[in-house]
């Protein structure tokens, strides 16, 4: 989104990383800039149904082909395989319902995200656990 570039650029500059990052706005349904070391999707896939998720991931894969060793990081809430009556699971369930009603998407488990990545011909290599309901799935070609 174009309006997200300015605050992101300011934060990157504050961290002294401007020479290491390029921020590009656009649609992930169109061709993505090719040849980057890293591609990042945060809270994107849960907005969409499986077919749209695979299209987005295929666009990432297409862009990654230009750079051997390129990685994709997918940051999303990771739903449990079986929900329990915990505050964490309840928060994920509420978000899941919100995604379904408002956007037609849903929260998914790590297994479900790995399946979407595989369908897009990407291989999930690891899950970087975060101290929250979010996880960071790392994927390669």
Regions found by a protein language model. Name each.
Residues 2-141:
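Alpha-helical subdomain
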């Amino acid at each position: 989104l174009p309006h997200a570039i300015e605050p992101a650029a300011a934060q990157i500059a504050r961290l002294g990383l401007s020479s290491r990052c390029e921020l590009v706005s656009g649609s992930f349904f169109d061709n993505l800039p090719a040849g980057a070391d890293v591609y990042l999707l945060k809270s994107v896939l849960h907005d969409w149904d499986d077919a749209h998720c695979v299209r987005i991931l295929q666009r990432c894969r297409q862009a990654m082909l230009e750079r051997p060793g390129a990685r994709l990081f997918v940051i999303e809430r990771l739903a449990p395989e079986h929900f329990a009556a915990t505050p964490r699971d309840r928060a994920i369930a509420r978000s899941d319902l919100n995604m379904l009603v408002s956007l037609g998407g849903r929260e998914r488990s790590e297994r479900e995200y790995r399946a979407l990545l595989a369908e897009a011909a990407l291989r999930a290599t690891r899950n970087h656990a975060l101290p929250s309901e979010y996880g960071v799935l790392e994927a390669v070609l």
